[in-house]
């Protein structure tokens, strides 16, 4: 492993470089003054009066719930026909019903086409629609941080943009492991913590 011209060696290597927010370029270009990522939203000095959340996955729903509780008027735009696509549909429907009761507006099956300043343009139910808000939160997903690793150069295999691993977090190169968002399995902090323990247990001979 080479870092800033310095070589580091080890019997085993664990890659844990995480992920970054996926930001569609055409959206960021016109809405950069109002368009925020979940990381940037955590640094807000005050609660916005209104928020449009693009994406109804874990991060989008989490922030929609939080901001609604803090007093924001929240609209969630989701391309699929239900929120939280990684959970059972019954759980998804219950969460949507409860959050709708709390005042959150969901637009399911909405296809966002453009973000310009404080306005989000989208297609919904065969019509062109738009919604204005003080803040637009981009939460359509994350991408593994693999740039600069030269992983392909040493023969590490990928599953799309994520590093492929087995149940023990091993890559196809036995002494190299990948944990957390970079392996693309489940992009949640507690999952990364567990995967770290799995990898260390395997390195210590306790993998079974």
Regions picked out by a protein language model, each given a short descriptive name:
Residues 3, 17, 37-39, 108-110, ...:
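Short loop/edge segments at beta-strand edges and connector loops
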